[in-house]
Amino acid sequence: SGDLLDAGVNRSPSGYLNNPAEERSKYRYNVDKEMTLVKFVDDEFGPVGSFNWFATHGTSMSRTNSLISGDNKGAAARFMEDWAEQNGLPKQTGHANSDDFGSLHLPRRVSTIIPEPDEITDDLMQLASSYKASGGRILASSNITRRIRNTQKNNAKFVSAFCQSNCGDVSPNVLGAFCIDTNLPCDFNHSTCNGKNELCYGRGPGYPNEFESTRIIGNRQFLKAADLFNSASEELQGKVDYRHTYLDFSQLEVSVSTSTGGQQVVKTCPAAMGFSFAAGTTDGPGAFDFKQGDDKGNPFWRLVGGILKKPGKEQVECQAPKPILLDTGEMKEPYDWAPAILPIQIIRIGQLVILSVPGEFTTMAGRRLRDAVKNVLISGSNGEFNSNTHVVLAGLTNTYSQYVTTFEEYQVQRYEGASTLYGPHTLSAYIQEFQKLATAMVANKEIPATNILPPDMLDKQIGLLPGVILDSTPPGVHFGDVSSDVAANSDFRKGSTVNATFHSACPRNDLLTDGTFALVERLNGDNWIPVYDDDDWSLRFKWSRPSKLSPESFATLEWTIPEDAVPGVYRLRHFGASKPLIGSIEHFTGTSRAFAVR
């Protein structure tokens, strides 16, 4: 494990400051900076993967982004896997440095690691000009599957996972939150600008380019993970074990300490969302006149929420000081609006203990849970667990139930507190029940069986997205034909963007899960070889239907040429699947005109 200092900031510092000063003084930062990594090594194949846990939200991309994205966590995982593939699954130890993995630059695809020609010649330009757009053509389903899987031929056996932790109040927008109209910092307590939450946005390190912010935060996590991977020396030894149970969080009795030092039994509540939930966060502001830090509410929105379900006196008192906007735990039509039955789980791999929680714990909430479980493990064992036991919190696991704050943070009613579903004692309930799991694990006992199980609501799901009726092209045009091609006799320098638009069809006809909608191919002798696909950071696939009532649609492929791309002749290729009004889905492909890369 090691600290990563520049990939997350606290987006609700006023809530964090409501925690006891004595508790806050134990920690240097108001977010967790530690990344914990597990390196997996096979006796035969060597390193085959890594899992790491680090707390930062996957919100580098804004809510206006319309492209499918794994955000900074997904980017980090891809960078790590490309790096491992490029380095031949390195077995060396010692700290990685910038020379090992390109500093802040992205790792190269394996397919690009070949000797580079010294320069682009006129002959190469002439060669590129001889390859025109292929025109669209139909492919048999079996052929497209085989063809697309061939584009993945360089996939490594290495798998890297960048797991979430107690990220509830942690933002990757590390430059801070500013008003978009004045460029001044947002109000500290309410994250508003002249009373409006809609104007307050967090800024990532690549501001104003959200793609660059995503790349930078992903790359910072990758660099730290690569460093920990290369320096990993502590071997996990001991038992592999777990404990798992389901609990009804809408009515748990919890024993908590009182201000006089005694104990008091309290209860959790049916789920409810507070007014500040609708205010959103600096990573994605809400709308209307909502604001964070609202522990009063207002009559108009109480009336609106009450039309759906007016909370009773007991629920209001249980959730206090949260003013209830949506009484989701008591709204049952057409099915439950919020979960009540949740899973909790402890997994042990030697001296590593993973706490699987079904929500987003804030920084201090996660710290309290980790410490409570570790204390039980150490005090209840005969040295099997000790100060060297690593306890990590795996957030958003097994199911999702919004946020979990400390009791003190809950009083402030920032977004995270308003989204803590089961009332002010939610964290205490988690701590109490995880301590029971830890006690059972130490004693080598099973968890008492219960009849509590989450409801199966698969047959109640409502789908509002209409199916694809048909796809079509203009007369004389085929699926896969180029609508807007790369300019003739083009050559591009690294860092430039090349794009081509194709007549296409709805991607929902076939998600091409094992394949790709987009390829960049390079000429190698007489053959075109795939070098980048739509999972690569440099290549984007954008589908659009200019008229909602038209069956015609287009796919634009945008390739920003990486700095380490091999000079040569390239082209863009699109894959898709079209649906006729009558008949079966047909797969198609088409290519752009060739172009040269210097």
Which residue stretches match the model-derived regions?
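Non-catalytic substrate/cofactor recognition surfaces at enzyme active-site rims
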Residues: S1-R598
